[in-house]
Amino acid sequence: MTIRLMENFRAIFYAPYYAIQTLGFYKSEGVDVALVTSDTPGDAVAHLINGTIDLAWAGPMRVMMAHERDLASSLVSFGEVVSRDPFFLIGNCDSFELSKLAELRFASVAEVPTPWMCLQHDLRETGINPDAIKRVSDRTMADNYAALRKGELDVMQAFEPFVSMAEMDRAGKLLYAASARGPTVYTAFIATRDAIARHREAFAAITRALAKMEQWLYDNSAEELAKAVAPSFGHVPDDILVASLRRYRDADLWARNPAMSKQGFSRLSSSFVSGGLLKRSPAYETCVEESLC
């Protein structure tokens, strides 16, 4: 049987999900995994519930929100991959501090909610009211990067490859790495409990493959990882891809084992509560399937 795995969206920080297939770790565990692309970020949940896919990778936010809407939701996360926040602030400011953000022309990520939710929580913890910050919140990262290059923005929030591009283009520099805050569970597998019951052996094999992949990440160079994922990022120049992956690897972005961090889960849910996305923090045990790890 083939497990249908849906991609959330294409991003360099998802490199382990592409490399695990290229390097044959699924195959070595005797499981066949077919990658399915999604139309928009977040639409995997509907596909999981109606059974058109078996598994997806996404932020635990999707699971947390599902449980807030329905206490009996069958959605769960397992197999942590991205264990820190992969977003950055990029700009041309000297001696930047978060407290200066209110004085600057700033654009946050519009494509998905988690980056801003996490950043606004960082701001609150430093005594800054995020509601007092004027920000552009309705443009893509690509559009914001174009504005940064033209001098129409001072600071933008983005993931790689925009940091490495900005450095190479001399359009800006790294001002703030959200990964530095520490564990924040950003991406894992999600499935329904029914699917886990049906495919327990296959999902256990996928988790074992993931453990091998995560060990490989820190035993090999960014150049080797770039070779493994290059087919998924044909539009990214080789030097930019390597620089992006090295930055993430050096930041300890990826988990070193598949068990989901309770500290990282708590940090993420607290960010959603303070930002108004959730009314209360969900229980770890309700949202995480621990038996597979």
Please report, for each region that a protein language model flagged, where it lies by residue.
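Predominant activation on well-ordered alpha-helical scaffold segments within soluble catalytic domains
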Residues: 18, 64, 120, 164-167, ...
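Secondary-structure end/capping motifs
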Residues: 197-279
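N-terminal hydrophobic or amphipathic helices and topogenic motifs
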Residues: 1-34, 255, 265-293
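Pocket-lining segment of extracytoplasmic ligand-binding domains
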Residues: 143-233
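Hydrophobic residues in alpha-helical segments
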Residues: 21, 48, 67-68, 148, ...
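Short, glycine-/small- and polar/acidic-enriched structural segments
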Residues: 2-128, 135-138, 154-160, 173-174, ...
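Short amphipathic alpha-helical segments at helix boundaries and their inter-helical linkers
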Residues: 53, 57, 149-150, 248-262, ...
